[in-house]
């Protein structure tokens, strides 16, 4: 993983050649990830200068060569519209240089919505190798209403929209290993939520004697309970919801599936994912 350190393009690295070797020995490829989660990062200025873009790219490719990685994944999120031209130019330059070293370039992107159309995904698709659509955060911490993190219709929309701009065999669908427990206080308009992993959600539902029912329209179990002052709801992510999402991904013949994030999953989910990968390969 790589992170921006300063405005000159210097990045910090957590890359490990030992980790890459372990992955390769297990028959896995490794794509080094660079993100923009540093609060000081601003693509409208950080990527506006050729010298800064060049410095970032040089470091990424040097690290990739040193560790023996197979590709680079760009996870720049919440981009401003004014910064998109600079972001696109960064991707063009990175992809050109990476391909010269036989490296794959993938980018992460939110589900296409009216308010993110300025991302110009069609233009990105002209040069990157893969696009990973993050089919989660349908409802998030700041949402005005409680709801699923990743309902089946939301995943279907993500797949349909992405395959309009990029061939299916270059699209990877990201699905969540997490959910949220939503609290709606009676008599109050504000709602709150807390992130839970798969086991955490199951345990919370059991401990609070929540009633769990399957919602076929959402492809999820929904757990609810009411107390004297509030309603608590969890749109569960479990083996059943994962399987419904994997069916969509498989049916669309996508390149693969990604997950966010490790440590939130139930152990049984991996057998489902492995079954999908083997069937789709």
Functional labels for PLM-detected ranges:
Residues 74, 131, 173, 249, ...:
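Conserved, mostly hydrophobic/aromatic
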Residues 7-14, 58, 81-205:
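Substrate-binding surface in catalytic domains of secreted glycosidases
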Residues 1-5:
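Conserved small/polar residues in nucleotide/adenosyl-binding loops
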Residues 46-65, 113-122, 237-250:
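Short, acidic/polar
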Residues 19-72, 76-77, 100:
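Substrate-binding cleft of extracellular glycoside hydrolase catalytic domains
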Residues 177-245, 277-281:
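Glycan-binding loop/region signatures in secreted carbohydrate-active enzymes
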Residues 13, 18, 25-27, 83-85, ...:
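Short acidic, glycine/proline-enriched helix-loop-strand junctions
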């Amino acid at each position: 993983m790589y992170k921006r350190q300063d405005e000159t393009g210097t990045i910090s690295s957590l890359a490990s050649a030992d980790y890459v070797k372990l992955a390769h020995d297990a028959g896995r490829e490794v794509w080094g990830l660079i993100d923009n989660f540093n609060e000081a990062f601003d693509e409208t200025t950080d990527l506006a200068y050729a010298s800064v873009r060049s410095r970032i790219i040089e470091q990424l490719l040097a690290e990739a060569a040193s560790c023996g990685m197979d590709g680079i994944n760009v996870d720049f999120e919440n981009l401003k519209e004014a910064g998109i031209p600079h972001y696109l130019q960064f991707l063009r330059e990175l992809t050109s240089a990476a391909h010269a070293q036989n490296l794959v370039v993938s980018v992460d992107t939110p589900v296409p919505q009216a308010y993110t159309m300025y991302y110009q995904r069609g233009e990105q698709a002209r040069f990157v190798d893969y696009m990973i659509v993050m089919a989660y955060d349908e409802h998030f911490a700041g949402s005005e209403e409680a709801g699923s993190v990743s309902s089946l219709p939301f995943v279907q929309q993500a797949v349909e929209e992405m395959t309009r701009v990029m061939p299916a065999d270059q699209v990877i669908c990201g699905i969540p290993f997490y959910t949220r427990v939503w609290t709606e206080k009676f008599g109050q308009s504000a709602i709150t939520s807390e992130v839970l992993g798969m086991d955490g959600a199951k345990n919370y539902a059991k401990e609070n004697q929540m009633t769990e029912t399957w919602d076929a329209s959402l492809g999820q179990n929904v757990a609810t309970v009411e107390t004297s002052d509030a309603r608590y709801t969890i749109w569960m992510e479990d083996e059943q919801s994962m399987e419904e999402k994997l069916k969509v991904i498989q049916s669309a013949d996508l390149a693969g599936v990604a997950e966010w994030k490790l440590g939130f999953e139930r152990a049984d989910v991996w057998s489902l994912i492995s079954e999908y990968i083997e069937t789709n390969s």
